[in-house]
């Protein structure tokens, strides 16, 4: 789940040329999200893909042997990650995933599954005013989840270190 790269991820030359930041080094400037003008079309975001969302296809992916998933969101808010994880957990449990909250937290006018399903007509999108308003509405509720004190769990740790043998570390919760 998360952002799709118009280029081959990490290989974007546009980021380096326009943004002076190498996507090859994890510093993508997201130049593809900018509006461009070409052939009479002005300020068109022709390279801006919607974020990928395969949550509705989770059971099918599991049947195909997919054992782990990645949420693309290293620069996203904790609320976004929480909404994505919640939707994935719900789908995995056979429940109806809360895609409305996930979409409200952040989307570019919805999501796409076009590369997976082959339905590529609605793959492009940008953040619209409605997307921003939805986020402002849902974020305070989700932020409350992070205002609770972090629970502390007592751990017992055993370390065994002997010359010529691999070190062994064992942790147990109380």
State where each predicted segment sits.
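Surface-exposed amphipathic alpha-helical tracts and adjacent flexible/coil segments at the periphery
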Residues: 1-174
């Amino acid at each position: 789940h998360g952002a799709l790269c118009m280029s081959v991820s990490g290989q974007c030359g546009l980021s380096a040329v326009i943004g002076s930041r190498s996507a090859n080094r994890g510093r993508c400037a997201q130049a593809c999200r900018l509006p461009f003008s070409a052939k009479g079309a002005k300020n068109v975001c022709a390279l801006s893909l919607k974020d990928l969302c395969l949550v509705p296809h989770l059971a099918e992916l599991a049947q195909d042997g997919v054992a782990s998933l990645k949420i693309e969101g290293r620069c996203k808010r904790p609320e976004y990650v929480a909404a994505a994880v919640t939707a994935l957990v719900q789908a995995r449990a056979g429940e109806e995933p809360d895609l409305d909250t996930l979409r409200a937290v952040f989307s570019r006018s919805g999501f796409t599954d076009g590369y997976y399903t082959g339905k590529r007509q609605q793959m492009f999108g940008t953040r619209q005013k409605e997307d921003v308003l939805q986020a402002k509405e849902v974020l305070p509720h989700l932020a409350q989840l992070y205002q609770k004190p972090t629970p502390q769990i007592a751990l017992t740790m055993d370390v065994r270190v002997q010359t010529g043998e691999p070190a062994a570390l064992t942790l147990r919760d109380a």
